[in-house]
Amino acid sequence: MSQAIPQVGVHSEVGKLRKVLVCSPGLAHQRLTPSNCDELLFDDVMWVNQAKRDHFDFVSKMRERGVEVLEMHNLLTETVQNPAALKWILDRKITPDNVGIGLVDEVRAWLEGLEPRALAEFLIGGVAASDIAGAERSKVLTLFRDYLGKSSFVLPPLPNMMFTRDTSCWIYGGVTLNPMHWPARRQETLLVAAVYKFHPAFTDAKFDVWYGDPDRDHGMATLEGGDVMPIGRGVVLVGMGERTSRQAVGQLAQALFAKGAAERVIVAGLPNSRASMHLDTVFSFCDRDLVTVFPEVVNRIVPFTLRPGGDARYGIDIEREDKPFVDVVAQALGLKSLRVVETGGNDFAAEREQWDDGNNMVCIEPGVVVGYDRNTYTNTLLRKAGVEVITIGSSELGRGRGGGHCMTCPVLRDPVDY
């Protein structure tokens, strides 16, 4: 079993990254086809073996810098060896709403008969009608396969699990279990919640769950981790655009304030666009006082602040900011200003590099980031500003529109003095 994490908590965007959760490409990405990739939120199919090599390189480069990397398939394999954990997952995943009333017993029995490693792979990679052996196939499953085809899914794959940033957010001393925006991603949170609830690496750690519950219908409230940045000094940045809704932002702020976990939430109103689906696609920290931004979007952000107070019923005071977003962030950190590196190249190159996650950097310590190799203009500008840019291959990993920041969920990160 993996060693227990003695401590969890993310206290900045740039402090030394100690522990991080990732999810390697696998069966879910082998299930991507030209006919289903759009529904599964990928722009194209992947060359999966190359994606695995590039992701392994990404993990290796973080480990070389002293980061402990936790991998989701491994954690889930170990989690389902606990009978209580397996029951908890299957009770919630194998339901009439998910697989159909006639398939619950058969699909559950088939999954329970798998070895832990294979079970974890299918929980993330999905179950096709053809996966369940013919001798065990019921009349209902046979009709399902004959009508919809052998490549139809009893349980859909979760290829976006690779972007571990989104399903949960470690904010200071606690975590959120995020209700995701698109149906293709909503089942991811259940698996992450199971790991946090049952895996020894987390059961031995003390933390609060600030917001989110896989057993609850959150309605119009959606929250994704690419929009959430605990930056220090009790401040949390939250993007509000395509993926994160105002309903979730208010509830998250309310929960953080009620437990004294944060003093201020700065909300970044974003355009509703896939290119800027999360705040971290247009804005990320690369050093304690340096950010990289896509100005076409960041200059249009509508910033406002939530603080404890105001209406006694809700405990939140709201204020529209009269300064640009970057200036508001600098002021919140006690800085006169932030150094800004814009997406590089001319207008055409900048738009391309933003699309290819040029602003989606993950900081592994102050002034050291990991990003995609293809964003040569932006990487060069960051290096000229004194940032060490460690590059990884991008041709396959980027097909789901996520870079180094998206592919990492920090679990333990040091604070930064401001």
From Swiss-Prot:
Keywords: Arginine metabolism, Cytoplasm, Hydrolase
Reaction equations catalysed: L-arginine + H2O = L-citrulline + NH4(+)
Cited InterPro entries: Arg_deiminase (IPR003876)
Active site: 406 (amidino-cysteine intermediate)
Compartment(s) of residence: Cytoplasm
SUPFAM superfamilies per the UniProt record, alphabetical: Pentein
Name the UniProt record assigns to this protein: Arginine deiminase
GO cellular component terms listed in the entry, alphabetical order: cytoplasm
Taxonomic source organism: Burkholderia mallei (strain ATCC 23344)
GO biological process: arginine catabolic process to ornithine; arginine deiminase pathway
Main location (coarse class): cytoplasm
Disulfide links within the chain: none
Family statement: Belongs to the arginine deiminase family.
Pathway: Amino-acid degradation; L-arginine degradation via ADI pathway; carbamoyl phosphate from L-arginine: step 1/2
Molecular function (Gene Ontology), one example: arginine deiminase activity
Gene from which this protein is expressed: arcA
Pfam families xref list: ADI
Documented EC number(s): 3.5.3.6
